Amino acid sequence: MALKIACGQIEIIAGRPDLNTKKILHHMDMACQNGIDILLLPELAVPGYFLGDLWEQTAFIEDCAAYGDEIIAATENCGELCVIFGNIAVDNSKRNEDGRARKYNAAFAAQHGKLLTNGTLPYDFIVKNALPNYREFDDNRHFYGLRQLALELDKQVAGLHQPLTVTAHGETVKLGLMLCEDGWTENYFLDVPQLLAQHGAELLCNISCSPFSINKNSKRHRLFGSAAQKAGIPLIYCNNVGIQNNGKNIFTFDGCSCVYGSDGWLLTDAPMYAEATLCAGWDSKAKAIDTSGITSDPRSEIDEVYHSLRYGCQRFLEQAGIGKMTIGLSGGIDSAVTAALFVDILGPDNVLLVNMPSRYNSPMTQTIAEQT
C-alpha cells in the first residue's frame, strides 16, 4: 500500500499564530478524513516569516511555542497522520549571539502526539542550516543556524544532515527534510540535498516560506529539478501564499508548490497565489512517487508581475479593511497604471480619480488625465 503524502499550500498571516494554527488544524482534520499519511506544511507556518523586532518579544515567542504544542498534541487524535510544519524553536538555556534566548528556524514532525527525531541533534526538531542574510532576509539577526550549532557541539555539520524515518500503516519512508534556503545549493558550499541522499534519504522534502521575485519560479524548477536528478530521488517543494511586511516592503508569497520525479522532471504543481493541496503516493517497495495532478502552463514575465502586484494590493486592502481608493491622476504613466490596477481590484465605482491643475502641469497632461 502506498503512503499518501499531501503538501498544504496555505496562506500564512505574519504575526498571527492563532489564525495560522487554526488553519493548520483544519488542514489536519481534512487530511485525516482523506486518509493522508504525511502532511507537509510551509516553513514558519505558525508565526510567519517577516516579523522584524517581533522576533525579540518573549510573549510572542511563547505564544508560538504554545500553538506548536497544540498542533503536536492534535496528532494524537489523527490516527497514523504525521504532520511536518515550520515553527520557531527556543532553547532558554542557551544564548543567541546577541545575548538573547536562542531561537531556531525549525521543522517539527509530529505523529501520535509526539515529535519524531533523526537522532543527530540534542533537540526533537530539525534546525535550518543556511540562514539567508541578503536583500529582504535578516535570519542571522534572529536565528541560530545548524552550522553554528555543529561548531558548538564539536561535530561536522555534514554529519548532522540525516533523514527522518516516518512509518504509517506498516509502510516506511526516509525523508530528507530541508528548510527553504537549505535547498538553494548554488548559493552555499554545503549541498544539503545530496548529503541527505547520501545518508539514506528516499524522498527529499523542502518546506519553504519563499517570496516572489521575477523569474524566481523558473529558477526554482531549475534548481530543485536538478537537485532531484542529481540525488536520484524525488523531491517535494512546499511553499506558502500570502503577503508579509519586513518593515520596509510588502512581499508577496506565490506558492507554486510542486513535486519532482527522481529524473528531475516536474510531475505536478500548485497554482500561483492560491491555497491548494498537492497529493502524491509513495511506493516504499519501488522507491517511487506517483501523482495524479497536472502541471500548469508557464506564465509570461509580464503576467507573473501583474498577478503579483494585483494579489499583493488586493490582500493588503482586505487586511486593512479598505474598500475604496482615491488616486491623484497627473496624466503621466505611473498614476495611469496605478489607476488601472486599483480599478481592476476594486471596480470603477470604488475608485475616485482626481486631477488638480496648477501652473506646473500643462494642458496636455490635464487632457490625458481626463481621458484616462
Q: How should these model regions be labeled?
A:
Residues G332:
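ATP/NTP phosphate-donor binding region
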Residues M1-G328, A339-N355, Y360, M364:
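Enzyme catalytic cores with a strong preference for nitrogen-chemistry domains
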Residues S335:
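Catalytic nucleophile loop
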Residues P363-T372:
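Glycine-rich phosphate-binding loop and adjoining beta1-alpha1-beta2 segment
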